[in-house]
Amino acid sequence: MNGYDLYISMDSNIQQYCEQAAEKAYIKKQADEVSVIVMNPQNGEIMAMVNYPEFNLNEPFTLIEEMGADGTESADKKQELLNRMWRNPCISDTYEPGSTFKIITLAI
């Protein structure tokens, strides 16, 4: 059975730059989290998407330090922290970029 082709629009150079910028902003501003999306305004393609802090995909059940875990959490609390860690704020949070995005759109 023939399958369908999958084409991605991610640009590895833009992705790497966004990851570095997100980490830098996280540290400099002492933010709780940083999310970045770079999108092509002509067609809506996502060129980069970053959430920081990020977790190790090879160890998805190990809580990252930034989650505030100290190893004494109850099972329910640990599950809550894991769900929060796995969540992708770029696509699941209801906050919209709003006016901060208009500047970028205007520049294009």
Predicted stretch roles:
Residues 2-42, 61-108:
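Active-site loop and adjoining helix of the penicillin-binding protein/serine DD-peptidase-beta-lactamase fold
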